Amino acid sequence: MQRVTSYLPAGTPSSHPIAQVKLPHDLRHLRRKLLHLENGEMVMLDLKDPVLFANGDLLVRDDGELIEILAADEKLFEIRGRDRTHLVELAWHLGNRHLAAQIEEDRIVILRDHVIRTMLQGLGAVVLEIDEPFQPARGAYHSQGGHSHGHDHDHNHDHGDDHGHDHSHSHDHDHEHGYEHEHEHRHDRGHDHDHKHD
């Protein structure tokens, strides 16, 4: 079986892929995974670090041949506002709920969520159901330089028992990333468990 240990960004000149692999957005964050290509073949992706791939990126096989990554169609909502200011306000509400969103000049695209649709319609948005590739904006945790987006999240949360804020969002991490996703959570609750009793 052919292996892939390197990649090229979309738009690389003189690139002629011999095969393609279609992946939804939540399966394009990869390090090591067996990929099933559109032509029925398989290839083993084995990268040094996790990478968040975009539509059109190219995987380089050990024999030098290229495989193009395509963003698969997904069930989405297209959100439109009355004007640009209204659209920015809608984007703020979505960001406040930590939702993955594809931000464009005249619309916002998100995964279908009927609770969110009701909220957006209440804010005056037009919400349409669409099926197309989804390329959400990369969050602050992803490196902005190049494609090496390792998840080095060092969560130093100082968790008091009373948070004082309401997180009205759910994190349904049904993501098959294909790599070891290690989060180091160091919770400082002010407890010293080294109890020395005289």
Curated annotation (Swiss-Prot):
Predominant subcellular localization, coarse grouping:
cytoplasm
CDD domains documented for this protein:
UreE
Basic and acidic residues bias spans: 149-198
Provide a GO biological process annotation.
protein folding
Location within or outside the cell: Cytoplasm
Protein's UniProt name: Urease accessory protein UreE
User: Which UniProt key words apply to this protein?
Assistant: Chaperone, Cytoplasm, Nickel, Nickel insertion
**Top-level taxon of the source organism:** Bacteria
What is this protein for, i.e. what is its function?
Involved in urease metallocenter assembly. Binds nickel. Probably functions as a nickel donor during metallocenter assembly.
- Disordered: annotated segments: 137-198
Q: Which family is annotated?
A: Belongs to the UreE family.
- Deletion phenotype: Cells are dependent on nickel supplements for growth, suggesting that this subunit is not absolutely required for urease activity.
InterPro entries reported in the protein's UniProt record: UreE, UreE_C_dom, UreE_N, UreE_N_sf
Give GO MF terms, alphabetically. nickel cation binding; unfolded protein binding
Enumerate the Gene3D superfamilies for this protein.
Answer: Urease metallochaperone UreE, N-terminal domain, UreE, C-terminal domain
